[in-house]
Each structure stands twice: as structure tokens, then as C-alpha cells.
Amino acid sequence: MIVYEVNIKVQLAHADAYREWLGDHIRELLTLPGFLSAEVFIAEASPGNIDREEIVVAYRLESHHALIRYLAEHAPTMRARAQERFTGKFEIQRRILAPFVEIVRADL
């Protein structure tokens, strides 16, 4: 299992429309092979980030291979759709997180 993390900063004026689009985008991604789940977070506003909303999406995939397949076969088209609709209205960064260790409370 890996986590594909997508960090989005969207202009406040377009945040509602972006979130609506993002919900559809995530549902579409979750139909692709290897995608297991997605969690969406809204970061609390920081002093230097008052004109943008920061959204973090953590996709869980069954393998690195599934992510590579998505990036090669689906990502270019899906990313182009976001650019067409929201050009200049958001910034995005992505990273891949591989499991290292899981520590669980002893009483669980």
C-alpha cells in the first residue's frame, strides 16, 4: 500500500467550484484499478495563506505499480481537464508516501 498525496492551493473565489469538481474527480479515480480510498482534508488557514484554501487529498493505492499505471495511462487527461476549467486559479504539489512502520497503541 502507498499513499499518493495531492496538495492543492485554490483561490478562495473559486474554492467552492473546485471542491465540487474535486468530488467528481475523486469518485472517477476510485473506479480505476489499484485505487482503494481517498481522504480529503482542508488545512486551517495560516497567516500567509488567507486568500487561498488548501486542500489535501490522500489517495491510498494497493501498490506503486498501480500509481505508475495511473500516471502513465490516466493522469495526463485528468490533469488537462482540471487545467481547462481552473487555469491560473490553483497550485498543486504531489508526493508519494511509502510505508515505513506502523505503531499502534498497546491497548487497541
Question: Model regions: which residues?
Answer:
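Short amphipathic alpha-helical segments
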Residues: 14-40, 79
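Aromatic side chains
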Residues: 4, 18-21, 35, 59, ...
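A short, structured loop/turn motif at beta-sheet edges
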Residues: 31-32, 62-65, 102, 106
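Short, well-ordered beta-strand segments in beta-rich or mixed alpha/beta enzyme
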Residues: 2-9, 41-73
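Glycine-rich beta-strand-turn "strand-cap" elements at beta-sheet edges
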Residues: 39-51, 80-108
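Short alpha-helical
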Residues: 13, 65, 77
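Short, low-complexity, polar/charged sequence segments that are solvent-exposed and flexible
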Residues: 23-27, 57-60, 76-80, 89
